[in-house]
Amino acid sequence: MKVVQRPLRSGFALLALVATIACGNGDSPSSPSPAPAGPAPPAAGANVFYTAIGASDANGVGGSVVCIPFAPCDTGTGYVPVLARSLRTGREVTVRNLGIPGAFLSPAAEQISREQGHSTTGNFVDREMPFVPGETTLVTVFGGGNDVNAITEAAERGAGGSDTKGYLDAQIRAFGTDYARLITGVRGRAANAFIIVVNVPNMAALPYARGYSEPRRRIMQHLSVGFAREANRQAAPGIVVLDLMCDGQAYDASRFSSDGFHPNDAGYSHLADRLRAIVNGASSSASGSCSQMTVVAAL
C-alpha cells in the first residue's frame, strides 16, 4: 500500500507539532536541565579508600606519633590516621597517604624557594597527584603554608622590586592556576572520589609568626587570604571546602606544637573532627570574610 503524506494545513499546525515534540523531550527553554551532581561522600557503612594529599601535616609532624612518609601508620596522631580510625567503625578504610614533609602545593612556589637557595622535596601537582589511585573514594587536600613562607621570604628579599603587592598578587594567581591543575588531575585519576579542599589559615596569625615584624606579617596575611580564596574557588559538584581560614579554634595556641607552625595532637584531632563531620554528611562552605583575615593591617 502506498503511503500518502498529507501536507500540514497551516504554519500553526507545524508550530504545534514542534512544540509538542520539544515538550515531550523535556527540552523547554523555560526548564533548564539541572547541573550534574558530583560524587557524594562515601555512604554510611560503605568501604572507604582514602587518599591524602598534603605536606608535613599529613604525616602528623608536631604530634606525638609522626608517620614515616608513604608507610602504613594506623597509630599516628596526625589528622590522616585519626580521621581514618574514626571512619573505621563498621567498615573497611584503606589509606594512601601521599604527604611529603616540606612539599609545596604549587610548582611555582617550589621554584621560588629554589631560587632563594633552598633544597625542596616536591610539590603536590608533580609529586603527589600522579599517584592518586583510581579506586579512591575520598580525597583530602591541605597545603599552602610552605608556599606562603617561601614567597614571603622572596618578597622580603626584593623579588617584587618596588611593587611588592603586584608581585604577591601574581603569585596568588599562579597558586590558583596550580590549584585548579591539581584538582583537575585528581578528578581525572579518581572520577568517583569525593574531594575535601582545606583552605590555608592566616599564617600571620599562627603562633610561629606572632614575633615577626609587622611588614612581614602583612605580606603573610595578604598571601594567606589570597591563597584561601583560590582554594575556595575549587568548590564544585563533588568538591567541598573546609574553611580553616575562618575557624577561630584553628588559631588557638594550645593546639600547636612547640614550633608554633605544626599542630599538636589536639590541633590534628580538631581538623580530623571537622573532616569526619563532612564525610558523614555535614554541609561545609567558605566564608567570604571574617576577622581572621585581618589580624594585621592590609597591604
Each model region followed by its residue ranges:
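Bacterial N-terminal signal peptides that target proteins for export
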Residues: 2-12
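C-terminal motif of bacterial Sec signal peptides marking the signal peptidase cleavage site
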Residues: 19-22
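Bacterial signal peptide processing site
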Residues: 24-27
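Serine-esterase "nucleophile elbow" of acetyl-processing enzymes
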Residues: 31-101, 139
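Short amphipathic alpha-helices and their capping/turn segments at secondary-structure boundaries
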Residues: 37-49, 82, 115-137, 181-192
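Solvent-exposed loop/turn segments at secondary-structure junctions
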Residues: 56-60, 100-106, 144-150, 201-206, ...
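Oxyanion-hole/transition-state-stabilizing segment in secreted/luminal serine hydrolases
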Residues: 61-63, 107-173
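Catalytic His-Asp segment of secreted/periplasmic serine-dependent ester chemistry enzymes
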Residues: 200-299
